[in-house]
């Protein structure tokens, strides 16, 4: 193993152990080549909803603004059509 490979391996190990390490954000939709986000794709939409039912902002998810607007619209449509809940599961 040469020095370059060893340094890369040590860097990766340090990043995994460091609790303050932040992974570089990227847009999932750009990587996948998605053109339009569909309101019927509930599995994808649920990934962008927080525990309390709020839409997660792009600065936290890394989603590009073009796709974030489509994502917001798709989530709102799914909520309006009762495909998704507006809030989390309340227990009275």
From Swiss-Prot:
Q: Where are the transmembrane segments?
A: none
The GO terms this record gives for MF are: small ribosomal subunit rRNA binding; structural constituent of ribosome
Q: Which domain of life is it from?
A: Bacteria
Entry annotated with the keyword Ribonucleoprotein? yes
GO annotations of cellular component type: cytosolic small ribosomal subunit
Question: What PROSITE patterns is this protein classified in?
Answer: RIBOSOMAL_S18
Alphabetically list the UniProt keywords: Ribonucleoprotein, Ribosomal protein, RNA-binding, rRNA-binding
Q: Which GO terms describe its biological process?
A: translation
Q: Does the keyword Ribonucleoprotein apply?
A: yes
Record's function text: Binds as a heterodimer with protein bS6 to the central domain of the 16S rRNA, where it helps stabilize the platform of the 30S subunit.
Describe the family membership recorded for this protein in Swiss-Prot or TrEMBL.
Answer: Belongs to the bacterial ribosomal protein bS18 family.
Query: Subunit structure, briefly?
Result: Part of the 30S ribosomal subunit. Forms a tight heterodimer with protein bS6.
Protein name, entry field:
Small ribosomal subunit protein bS18
The source organism is: Ralstonia nicotianae (strain ATCC BAA-1114 / GMI1000)
